[in-house]
Amino acid sequence: MTLKELAIGCGTTLRSIWMIGMQAFNKRETRMYPDVPVNPPPRFRGRIVLTRDPDGDERCVACNLCAVACPVDCISLQKAETKDGRWYPEFFRINFSRCIFCGLCEEACPTTAIQLTPDFEMGEFKRQDLVYEKDDLLISGPGKYPEYNFYRMAGMAIAGKDKGEAENEAKPIDVKGLLP
């Protein structure tokens, strides 16, 4: 090692110390997380919840599209039917230890039952505690779409109404009446 190389090494070290010392007077970029709350961006995809209709019924019709759309297969559900013919999930289970929070289940849901919230604090000590059942996922409100009711929009008979009598729905067309 020559004297020239030693001088260059010392100069580089002193320059690095100078640059680091100048950063001591700048504003910190790091936030002290538990003390300072973190505000995620508006389209942040966090914890998954199941919402209800404005009437208070479950929105989920157990169509299984969310489970099919999930790339890591963390959603499982079983369909059941009420006496009036309405479908609902008998059980709905999400394994959050496998979930990658991609949001494909929310996009696939035709009833807007699945919605992603900005909650991100889901740490647990046991992996079994990250498996959420329907009772854990179901919230009391309608979520992002307060006025939407799938059965009213889809035209399924509600409380004795026939097809065509629901909100924003036309009467069924008689195809035989169109023939010459």
UniProtKB/Swiss-Prot annotation:
It is an enzyme of class 7 (translocase). It catalyses: a quinone + NADH + 5 H(+)(in) = a quinol + NAD(+) + 4 H(+)(out). Its cofactor is [4Fe-4S] cluster. It is found in: Cell inner membrane. GO terms for biological process: aerobic respiration. NDH-1 is composed of 13 different subunits. Subunits NuoA, H, J, K, L, M, N constitute the membrane sector of the complex. NDH-1 shuttles electrons from NADH, via FMN and iron-sulfur (Fe-S) centers, to quinones in the respiratory chain. The immediate electron acceptor for the enzyme in this species is believed to be ubiquinone. Couples the redox reaction to proton translocation (for every two electrons transferred, four hydrogen ions are translocated across the cytoplasmic membrane), and thus conserves the redox energy in a proton gradient. HAMAP family: NDH1_NuoI (MF_01351). This is NADH-quinone oxidoreductase subunit I.
